[in-house]
Each structure stands twice: as structure tokens, then as C-alpha cells.
Amino acid sequence: MATDGASCEPDLSRAPEDAAGAAAEAAKKEFDVDTLSKSELRMLLSVMEGELEARDLVIEALRARRKEVFIQERYGRFNLNDPFLALQRDYEAGAGDKEKKPVCTNPLSILEAVMAHCKKMQERMSAQLAAAESRQKKLEMEKLQLQALEQEHKKLAARLEEERGKNKQVVLMLVKECKQLSGKVIEEAQKLEDVMAKLEEEKKKTNELEEELSTEKRRSTEMEAQMEKQLSEFDTEREQLRAKLNREEAHTTDLKEEIDKMKKMIEQLKRGSDSKPSLSLPRKTKDRRLVSISVGTEGTVTRSVACQTDLVTESADYMKKLPLTMPVKPSTGSPLVSANAKGSVCTSATMARPGIDRQASHGDLIGASVPAFPPPSANKIEENGPSTGSTPDPTSSTPPLPSNAAPPTAQTPGIAPQNSQAPPMHSLHSPCANTSLHPGLNPRIQAARFRFQGNANDPDQNGNTTQSPPSRDVSPTSRDNLVAKQLARNTVTQALSRFTSPQAGAPSRPGVPPTGDVGTHPPVGRTSLKTHAVARVDRGNPPPIPPKKPGLSQTPSPPHPQLKVIIDSSRASNTGAKVDNKTVASPPSSLPQGNRVINEENLPKSSSPQLPPKPSIDLTVAPAGCAVSALATSQVGAWPAATPGLSQPACSDSSLVIPTTIAFCSSINPVSASSCRPGASDSLLVTASGWSPSLTPLLMSGGPAPLAGRPTLLQQAAAQGNVTLLSMLLNEEGLDINYSCEDGHSALYSAAKNGHTDCVRLLLSAEAQVNAADKNGFTPLCAAAAQGHFECVELLIAYDANINHAADGGQTPLYLACKNGNKECVKLLLEAGTNRSVKTTDGWTPVHAAVDTGNVDSLKLLMYHRIPARGNSFNEEESESSVFDLDGGEDSPEGISKPVIPADLINHANREGWTAAHIAASKGFKNCLEILCRHRGLEPERRDKCNRTVHDVATDDCKHLLENLNALKIPLRISVGEIEPSNYGSDDLECENTICALNIRKQTSWDDFSKAVSQALTNHFQAISSDGWWSLEDVTCNNTTDSNIGLSARSIRSITLGNVLWSVGQSFVQSPWDFMRKNKAEHITVLLSGPLEGCLSSVTYASMIPLQMMQNYLRLVEQYHNVIFHGPEGSLQDYIVHQLALCLKHRQMAAGFSCEIVRAEVDARFSKEQLLDLFISSACLIPVKQSPSKKKIIIILENLEKSSLSELLRDFLAPLENRSTESPCTFQKGNGISECYYFHENCFLMGTIAKACLQGSDLLVQQHFRWVQLRWDGEPMQGLLQRFLRRKVVNKFKGQAPSPCDPVCKIVDWALSVWRQLNSCLARLGTPEALLGPKYFLSCPVVPGHAQVTVKWMSKLWNGVIAPRVQEAILSRASVKRQPGFGQTTAKRHPSQGQQAVIKAALSILLNKAVLHGCPLPRAELDQHTADFKGGSFPLSIVSSYNSCNKKKGESGAWRKVNTSPRRKSGRFSLPTWNKPDLSTEGMKNKTVSQLNCNRSASLSKQKSLENDLSLTLNLDQRLSLGSDDEADLVKELQSMCSSKSESDISKIADSRDDLRMFDSSGNNPVLSATINNLRMPVSQKEVSPLSSHQTTECSNSKSKTELGVSRVKSFLPVPRSKVTQCSQNTKRSSSSSNTRQIEINNNSKEENWNLHKNEHLEKPNK
């Protein structure tokens, strides 16, 4: 039962298993796990996890239930009371396993089987889940890639659409352009037809003109015939006139006889007059008060003025009415005029130069013409013949003028017009009451003279002519009548004067005055007008009173009060001056008859300083017949200063003109200049202090002519800038301020024309008419603009003057300002908004006017000056910002602002058809023409009425400018493409260089263009590869096509004109000029053939290595396959190797092979195994069993100097040489597997070593490779830097090579010499590892005008690269192993003091010899930059004073520590001297010792601050030690470099620098060093050089070389013979103990001491 009951359970338990297996089999058949999705896999996983959990729960439940069922089944049937049942149970339990049968199935085994099955299923499911997850991740990655591809596809699609849109627009534009071009073709055809029609018309006109010309020729022949006929008539008339002349000569002879008779009669009359007694002359002389004035504008060299003196009769009435007079100083070198004199215009036609005619269009607005000065007379200038008397002041009487008559001016023919701009010649005169009549003259003639002259001015009883002032109610008609009468009298008087001329040589009869001057006006000199010197009257005898003649009017003069001047007595006492006890006065002269000239030798010469002349008076505004009063000559501030040259006249800016009339009241005696101060209240003239009270009666006083009313006086005041008088007149009522004279000039016009801004402001404030025009239509603004008075222009514009007013000829203020070149006025008018296009009647514009005078500034303003914003017309900032740059802009057209004037105005033609360009070209104004050509609308082909273009009328310079007008200046550039990669030392290599600019003209053909490009390239290649500084012009004469670097026109790969490819010799339909303009080509780029084409031309141009050498390097690589390039660091090895690899790769690819470049950078950690993996992975090393491929491999090993060549390449040397399967080599891989390999024949191996030469074990590798050495002193490195820097300079100057004297060339040459000198010095020192290639100097900055930039760059290069390398090289050379465990690395980290001193000395010498020497900077600037260089202040005397100590064999050259104990007395030490080696027998040059300078203490502090590390390393307790021969050799080599003549001599620098010392070769200078122990040493610190020490350092040898155990490296430098000799000599050893040191001086020792810093003690390093 138990068995049965137990046997049914397994069936139940197997049933679900069978069911599950069936279900699983069915599931496998239904679906595949690999095809499930992610969600289905997740669902399956969750179901299976739930099933596992359910199974676990079922197992647990079954375990709990099965225990109870088992007990029940096993023991439930049995009853304990039945013993047989227990026996049966025991029997079954005790039976054997084979015999007994299980009662029931074991449930634990079932459970274990189920659990094992479940675990297997779980493992399977986990594996399937991991696989599913990996597939899911891969799927997600693919989805992301798909999305990225879709996005990229979208972008490409969008870009494609954009390109389609752009292309569509381009196509539309092209279609549109085609339509426009077709329309233009039609228009051009129409224009051509019109032009042909015009041509036919012109031909017809030409035929007509030819006919007219023939007609004119016939007329001319007829005219010639008439001329011949008239000439014959003239000959006949000439013969008749000759006959008449003979008759006149006979008549003249008769007249001469009559003259002789008259002379005899005159002598008889004189004898009769001498017999008669005369009045008492001495008393008359004392009472005579005659003062004459000389007024002038010139210096001492003047012309005399003829005067005649009035006679003063002696009577009681005269004494009563005599005005107050005073003695005054005589003038210096100027004629003297009577106080009663009146000035008049010289009426001689030869004396005055007529001014510019008023009827001219605008000529009267331009400045005054230059007066013509007649030559000075010899000794005495006389009037109407020689003088008849010998007295110094001959006098005569002349008839007076009418009281209201004006002197003859413009109305009389032959007289200078009063409105003339030229200063008229004039004389000073005074009327006289008593006339002198010639006794021999006909009485009828004398009566006629007095008929016309006697009634003019009646003399008073004193003999002075007084003239009453004109009353205010004098009508113009009366004035005109008076003027007409005066003119008539003057005319008749001139006619009569021909017959009343005195006879030459006639003696004067006593009692009868000398002959009067009644002739015509003589050609006297220009009057010298002076107001600061007045002479007193001469005390000589007065002339007698002539007898009264019948017919003379003796009526008294009209009543007129005499104006008297009150003079202070103290002031008057100092005003007179006598010269040689005689005061010279010139006699008064008559007005119309003539001028008497006195002898200039009799004029006094005063020692008083000449004061500035009184400003002249311009009376051009006064009408004809108007006289000028003395008041009108006054100006504000017009008095001369007391000291010459301290003050200027008030109107010094106006043109210098002479007053036409100078009037003085007959009763006023002028005072001297000393009393005429501006502050004097009694001054006769108006001064800046105000209106003088004494001037009021002066205005009413009499004069030579009436003042013609207040308006005329107003014009005179305005013309002369007399603000005080003008303001007083403006304050009067009823005055017409707009009154105009005959020519239409108002007071405002006169003030504006003469530039009197204050007067203009006064008149404008008084509401004067601002636009009042004269008879020619010119306004005050026109006058001010023409004269350049910009302040008046600004003021008139502010008062709303018409800025566009045109005169009768069409001239506007802008036109007049441009015509006269007044830039400021042009600017003001343009800012006010004037019209620039107004034309004159002859078709001229302001542009024509500016160009006609060649005024560049005005033309620029017209073209480029913009009108500022409204209301800011006079804002300086606004106007300045809008003004075109008048100084620059010619060389930079792109920086010029756009012109503001239209093309129509630029091309406007005048009446003759000339444009502004025609005028500028014809006159040779190249600057103006160039400015006009900048306007794009200029039409240089426009023709004038004579069918001439601008080029036809242009000068040679302007023709050249016009020919190059439309020339395109396109820069020509050379491109080498991209230099890659940048880490190959190509950072400083330029990709593009501008070599020149090509001028492409309209007539340039494609052949000419090709030749120009080829020639420019050839010239550039030759210029940069030459030895000197060549310009492009210098190399044009060289016919060679190839340069020194091998580049030529054949090196060109392609040429691009803008963006269009072009090749030399190719031609397009369009000309080059049209092609460049249409394609907007801004540059021409020449691309050189490079490695991509299998050529090396671009590499040659980029690196400046000659093409032949690069090709040779490439041939070596192709031939030998194993090439190593080595040279000093910075020799461009990496760049050369990479470019060769690129070229080789593309050559192989062109031949049909696939090629690959493999680059490996070697460092100290790079092992042989890594190199093996590199060779194997790159298929260079091929297993013997494997067949070789056709692929070419180029392997580049860089920086091989960082590892040991023998260790790295030892195993590869044999297979590299024998590349075949016959000589395989076994290599062991990293996994320990060994295999045989051989090198592929198509493998190229190139390496680079930054080392000048190989040493030691590396030499074993040398024979297995082809070596290319890049020496610094040989090509290609020797000339590379020179060529590279020259190309950089040419590129900086845009293709033009500067002259060798240019500072840029000098600084570049200096940088080149620094590199060469530095390597030369380092080679002499035996430190090849410190040599530098040219790479570090390729970055030399080229900044024109800033050489300091290059010096600063050099200091950074020195401190960052050169100095550390030199320091390391010197240290490695001088360091030795002093102990077995003391390695070289430790020595480098902790150098000894001797090594530090040697390093600093080497740096200082290298800096001064190689770097600072030859610097083109001035010494002062170089001193400022010296502090930036490291190691430049080391004292060089230390090096020059050292010499290796003599020592025995086995002794070292160690320095002994000096005793600094204060207890040691100085008496035990003898002062050592410099022991010079006796080298006379050795033939060695004696090493020199520097003379210590005592005045260098000031520079020491500076050196200490610059070199702090020296004082830090050499302290008080240390001393210098030289422990090896190498250090001694270095010092000796440094010494020889200091005194070398083959190298740059630093002594040339030393004598002008503080941180260097001169090296004296005499060798006789004692040592100025003393012990510091003796404090009582008489040598002071100031007397000792800073470079010497106060302590004594002795050289002693204490230990032998064997004791030190020093392993010394032999020096590579040559050892001089003296050293061997010195080493063989014996020196005594000085014994020392721990407490005391006994120093024994050997006088025979050949040794020298080091003189170090005075505060530094030297100590031997502790052993």
C-alpha cells in the first residue's frame, strides 16, 4: 500500500513537468526569441520571473505537506498494539538495499530535480536576456545614427534648396542682364547713328569753314595791299615831317639867341636891385616861424619833395595874430615841409601809376597793384631845370589856391585817378600869398597867371593863406562850379608854365627872390610820408618881398578864427633838436605848378630810432574832388610806438596806399611824435582814448578843399577802420549811412572790403543796408569774400546777407572767394548753404575759378564739404567733422568721402567749351586734376569748341596722370597653399605674400598682361634671392629667368584673376581692363606647384630653401630609402621631412600606387618594442611567409635625439640594409612569440635629429643610413634666414624693396648678424649643442618705424631660448664628477660657484659680442633695452684678468680660502701683484688686464640691480673654484674672444657703456686690490674699482688630482703651448693646518688672480 500510495505521487509531479515541456516545445515551435521586440522580451522576462517565484512557493508548500502525508502513509496503517506490524516495519528497514523495495518515492529527490531544472532554465533565460539587451543597445545606436543621417540629409536638402534658389536668382539676374545688354546694344546702335549724323553735320560745317577761310585769305591779301599803300603814304609824310623839323630847329636857334638876350637883361635888373637898400633882414629872420612836416611810409632812403616857403612880413598885426609855435625835432632822412603846407596829388602822368579800372568785371576787388618806384636821383633833383641859386633853402612864392578849390584829381587827363588802388605819387606844398614873378617875363603872361590863380585864395596880412571851411548849406552845384573853375585854372596854369620856367644857371639877384617854380610837374621821387619827425624853421635870411604888381587882388581873407594848440611848456622844451647848429626846413611848394626839390645832402641825419610808419590812408571810397582832412587820417591805435617794432599799425593787414590829399590848417604847427601819445588830450589825431575836445574846431577849420559833407567822412572813417570817428558820426542825427559815392561804394562796402570787422559790426548794428551793391553789382559780402576777410564774411552772413548774390558779371561771393584762394571764406559760405553751381556770364563756375588759380584746398572744399545741420552752421565740431581732409587722402582713395557735387557741375563747360579739367590740365595743376579725376562722373573725353579733349591740352605730367587715370592697380600675390600640419615648424611660414601691384590700363592686351605677370614674378624671385637689397627696378635689367633659389615662371601651377582661373598666354574676349572691372577682381593670386603636384616649388618659396637642394633631398630618399636629417635645433628638419614625404606620396599615387605616411614622435620613453609594433602595424616589417603588397609606406621618426640611436635601431640596421626575404630577422613580439620578418622594399624611412653632430655609440648607426647634415654655416641654412627676412620686408612694403639705408633693412641685417655671430661664438666655445637653427629667428617682427619692437623681441628670444640653451651647454661642458657618487645631473642642479661665474661670463660676452653689437638703435635707446637682456651686467674684467694657475703634475687648480679673520695682521701678507707669464720665448700673445676705472661706482648699483643672482650665488663665505681643465679652457677661450680681432670687438662698445670695460693691452697696470683685514688701509672704497675686491685672493695648490679622485673629461678646445709650459713649472705648496694657514708667495709662479665684487668673499667649496 505504501508502495502504491507512494507511486501515485510521482505521476502527479511529472504531469506538470510534462505539460511544461510540451508547452515549451510548443512555444519554441510558435515563436523565436531572436525575433521578439523589446516590449515582448520584457513581458517574457516578467512572466518567467513570476513562474520562478510560483515554483518556489509550490516547492515550499509541497515540502510542508509531504511530511505529514509520509508519516501518515508510513505509519498510519499500523497499530502500535499489533507487534507483528512493528516486526514487519523493522524487517523492511533492516533488509538490504537490493532486496527491499522502497515503500514510496523520495520527495527530496524530486524537489532537487525540479530545482536543478529551474536553475538551468534561469541561467538560460539570463543569457538570453543579456543577448537581448546587447541587441537592443546596438539597435538604439543604429537608430541614433539613422536620426543623425536623417538630420544631415535634411540639412543637405535645405542647403540644396538654398543653392537652387541662389542659382535661380543668378539665372534671373543673368537673363535680366542679357536683356539689359541687348537694350544697351540697341541704344548704342542708335547713338552710333546719331553720332554718324553729327559727323556728317560737322563735315558740312567744316566745309563751310574752309570756304570762309578762303574768303578771309582773300580779304587778308587785300588788306596787305592796302597796308603797303598806306606805308608808302607814311613814308611821304615822314619826309614832310623831317622838313618841318628842320624848320623848327632853325626857329629854336633863334629862340636861344633871344634867351641869351633875356639873360643879359636879368643881370642888369639884378645889378639895379642890389643897389637899392632892403629891409632889416636879421630881425625878420628871428621872427620867422616856419615849421615843415615830412610824412612818409618809407625808410631813410626817400625822395625829396619840392616846397616853397611863404614869407612872413614884419608888423605889429602879425605879432598879435601869430599862432603858438614850438621847436620840434627834425626828421631823419626825409624831406621837410612847411607847417602851412598842403599835400596834393602829383599831376604828372609819369609820377602816378593809374589803378585798375573800375569798369572791370571784378578787378577792383582784388588787392592793390604794386607801385612803380622811380630810380633815385643823383645829388640834387630840381624842378624845371637846374637851380639858379646856391642857398640851402631857396624859396619862391606861388599863387594860392582858391579857398574852396580841390586839387586836380581824376578829372584832369594825365593825372592819377583818385579811386586808384595804387598809391599815387604826391608832394607836400603850402600856398603863398606873395608870388615871385620873373622880371624878364612878359607882363601879359604874368597877368594871365594871376588872373587864374590870384583869386583862388586871398592872402592874409601875415602872408599866410587861410581857407574858411565850407558851410553845411553849400549846394552840390556850387561845389561842382568850384571844381570846374579850379580845373580850368590848373589847365591854363600848366600851359603858361611852359613859358615861365626859370632859366638854368641864372644867378639870383639880391632883394629879389629866386626864380619861382611855375613849370609843369617834374618826375620827382616818391614822397616819404612821416608823422613822427618835424623840423624847425631855419634861422637864415628870408627871401625879400616881391614888388606888387597891378591886377593882383589885395582883398583881405574871409574872417576865420585861428585854431591854436596849447602845448605844455615842459613838453615843448624837449621837442626841438638841432643838427650842426642848423635846422633844415624845406620851403613850401605850390600845388598845381610844380614841386621844388631840395638837395638831399642837406637833410639832417638824426640818431633817434626810426618809428614804424603811420598807416596810410586809402581814399578810394571818396568821390572825385573830395579832399581829406587831417582828422580823417587818424585811426584807433595808429600812433607809432616809442620803440621801433613793438607795435603794428591798426590797419596793417590792409593794402598800403597813400592819401591823395593831406590837408593841414595853415595856422596849426604839428607837434613831435614824443608829444603825440595816445593818452595826450591835446593830440591832433583821434586815438584809442576817445574823442579829443580840440578836434571839434578842427573839423570846422579850413583846408585845401571841402570835406564834401558828413557822408564822405563816414566812408573815409569806415575805409580806414576809425571806430571812434565812425561811432561819433553814427550817433549824429540825419546822417545817411547808406550814402554811396559815384562808383556806388557805401560805408559798409568800404569797411568790408578793407577788413574792418568792428566798423562792419557798427554799421550793421546801425541798420546799414547789407546787400547794397555798387555800380558793378558787388555787395559788401562780395568785397569781403574777394579780399579774404572771413570775419567780415561771417558777420555779414549772420546779418542775412545774400550769399547767392550775383554781380553784373555773374560773380557770386563763393566764386570770388575761390578765385582768390580764400579757403576760410569758402568754408563759411559753403556752411551757410550757398549755391555751388551758379555760373557767370562767361560760363565759369566756382570750380572753374578754384582750378584756374590752382587752389587745391578750395577745390577740395567745393567737392567734399557737406552742409552741416541747420542751426549748426558755425559749430566748429560740426564743421570740422564734415570737412574733407585737405592734407591727406591722395594715397588712399578708399578712405575718401563721396563728393557732394554732381557730375554735371564737374563737367560743365564755359563759353569756350572748357571744363575745369581742361583748365587744370592746360596749366599743369596736377593736384587739382587728380582731385577732379577722383570724381567718378568726370568725363575726360569731353571736347571743347575746338574739338580738343583734356588730354590734348594737358601738359606732360598731366598727360601721364590722365593715361593712368583709369588704370586698375591690382595687387599680385603668391600663394603656396595651406602648410600642414602646423606643428612641423611652419608657424612662421607665410602662406601668401603680396609682391607688387600691376597697372592695367584700357589699352593693355592679354599678351602684355602675361608678360607683366611673368616679369613681376621673375623680378620678385631674383630680388628675394639676391645677396643685397635690390629693388624691382634694379633686377629688371637682369635677363636671367631663374633665380638663385630655382624659382621662375615655370614654377606656377595656376593663376586666379579674382575667382577665375587663368594661365599665362591665355586670352579672353574682353580686354584685361574690362575683364577685371566686370569680374570685380580685387587681386591676382599666383599658386605655385607644391607637393600635391609632385613638385617642391611652393616648399621652396615658403621655406626659402633652394629648389635644387630640395630636389636633391627627394632623390636621396627615393634612392636610399633610409635618410636621416640632422642639424642644430631649429633647422626645419621636421618641415623638410614632412614636405618631402608629401611630395613622394603624391608622386607614388600619380604612378598608380597607394601610399601612406606614418609619423612617430620619439621621446625618452619610446622603446624598441614600440618601434617594432610600429613597423609591423604599418606593414613595413612583413612576415617571411606573407607575400608583399604593392602599398608604399613612408615612416617618419621625429626627435631621434631624445633617445639612444644605438639602442633603438640596433636590431633593425641589418634588415634595413638588406630588404629581401633572403635576409630575414627574427623579432619577438610582446606576447613572447618570435617570428621572422623582413623589411618591405617599398618602405621609406626618414628621421630627424636636432643635434649638430653625433657622439659616442650613436656613431655606430651612421654607416647604415644616408645622412643629410643641415649646417648653420652652409647652405641651405646659411642663406635661408636672409632670404626669408628679405621676403618678409618686401611683403611688408607691398612689393617694394626699401633702400639699404632704410631703418627696416638695418634692423633686419642686425637680426641676421645676431644669428650668425651667436653661432660663431658658440662654435668657438666648443658647445655645438647650443647652436641654433634659423627657425627661431623667422618670427623677427618687421615694423617700419618701430625698431624697438625688434629689440624687445630679441630680448624675449634671448631670455627664453638662447640664454637657457647657452647656460645648459656651458654647464655640461664645465661640469665634472668630483666624487664617485656625484653625477653630472647633480652638477647641473647644483653648479659650483666657478661654474656659475663661467656661465655668467659667457652670457655677458655673447650678449655684447653677438647681440648688442651692431644694433642700429641709438646708444640712449639701446641702454634702455639692455636691462631686458639676461646676463648683460656681468663684470668682464673677471674673465680678462684670469689665467690658469701654474700647477705641478697631479695638482688641481683649486682656489684657496682667504683668511678673513680680523686678528690676522696685514703685515704678514704682502700685496700681490699681477704675475704675468713670461711668454716671450713661447710666442704667445700676452693676455691683457682691464684698467680698473674708479668712476664706475655709480653704474655698479645699476648692474647689481640687474644681476641680483650673481650676488646671491657668490656670497661672503664662498670663493670661486675652477676644478678642471675644461673650466680653465673655457675661461681662456672667453679671454681670447674678448680680445679677438677676428670677431666683433666689444671694446668698441665698452668705452661708451657702463657695464663694459676697455681691455688694455699694455699689461703694465698694477693690481688695485688690498686685504680687507687691514682696516687702516689708506685705499678708500671710492678709489677702488667696483670690480675689484678689498680682500687679497691668492692662488694655492693644496691637493693633488689623485687625492681628489677627479675623472676629468678632456677638452675639445686646442690647448695653447703656454699652458703645457706652465704645467711643467713647479710652484711651492703652501702648508695649512686647521687653525692657521701660512701663505707663501712664489714670485716665480705664473698665475693671475680674479677680481670679483668688492662685497663678495671667495671660498673654496667644501670637499
Curated annotation (Swiss-Prot):
ANK repeats: from-to residues: 709-739, 743-772, 776-805, 809-838, 842-871, 912-942
Modified residues (Phosphoserine): 1524
SMART domains: ANK
KW Cytoplasm (keyword) present: yes
Residues in coiled coil: 119-276
GO MF terms, alphabetically ordered: protein phosphatase 2A binding
A GO CC annotation given for this chain: FAR/SIN/STRIPAK complex
InterPro entries, per the entry: Ankyrin_rpt, Ankyrin_rpt-contain_sf, Cortactin-Actin_Reg, Cortactin-binding_p2_N
Spans annotated as Disordered: 1-23, 203-222, 359-440, 454-478, 498-617, 1446-1485, 1580-1663
Places the protein is found: Cytoplasm, Cell cortex; Cell projection, Dendritic spine
Biased composition (Polar residues): 583-593, 1582-1599
Modified sites of kind Asymmetric dimethylarginine: 498
Swiss-Prot/TrEMBL keywords: ANK repeat, Cell projection, Coiled coil, Cytoplasm, Methylation, Phosphoprotein, Repeat, Synapse
Segments of skewed composition (Low complexity): 386-396, 1624-1638
Pfam families assigned: AAA_lid_NAV1, Ank, Ank_2, CortBP2
Positions with biased composition (Basic and acidic residues): 1645-1663
Described purpose of this protein according to its UniProt entry: Regulates the dendritic spine distribution of CTTN/cortactin in hippocampal neurons, and thus controls dendritic spinogenesis and dendritic spine maintenance. Associates with the striatin-interacting phosphatase and kinase (STRIPAK) core complex to regulate dendritic spine distribution of the STRIPAK complex in hippocampal neurons.
Subunit structure: Interacts with CTTN/cortactin SH3 domain. Interacts with STRN, STRN4/zinedin and MOB4/phocein; this interactions mediate the association with the STRIPAK core complex and may regulate dendritic spine distribution of the STRIPAK complex in hippocampal neurons. Activation of glutamate receptors weakens the interaction with STRN and STRN4.
Name of the protein in question: Cortactin-binding protein 2
